[in-house]
């Protein structure tokens, strides 16, 4: 039985990769990577996101200047069709991932009830 659970997990991984929503994220990501300005903007977003997450994990909040930078970056992303499509595709995929997470972790929740 223990090996079987890994087989199921691998099957789930393949199923996620086959989802049209997953394929859409890949497609849009490739388009972003082919566009220098979109790619730079995406890299800037990732760096900003990592910085903010690191700050919050250490109990710090973004300064007013950093919040302004975040807002400006968000506006640039909204104005870029490829990045906008990427985040929309990510959102559609995250619905599946959220549902899968809920299903997979249901037995663990039962243990703490």
From Swiss-Prot:
It comes from the Bacteria. It holds the Pfam family Com_YlbF. Coiled coil: none annotated. InterPro entries: Com_YlbF (IPR010368), YheA/YmcA-like_dom_sf (IPR023378). Signal peptide: none annotated. Belongs to the UPF0342 family. This is UPF0342 protein SPy_0811/M5005_Spy0626. It comes from Streptococcus pyogenes serotype M1.
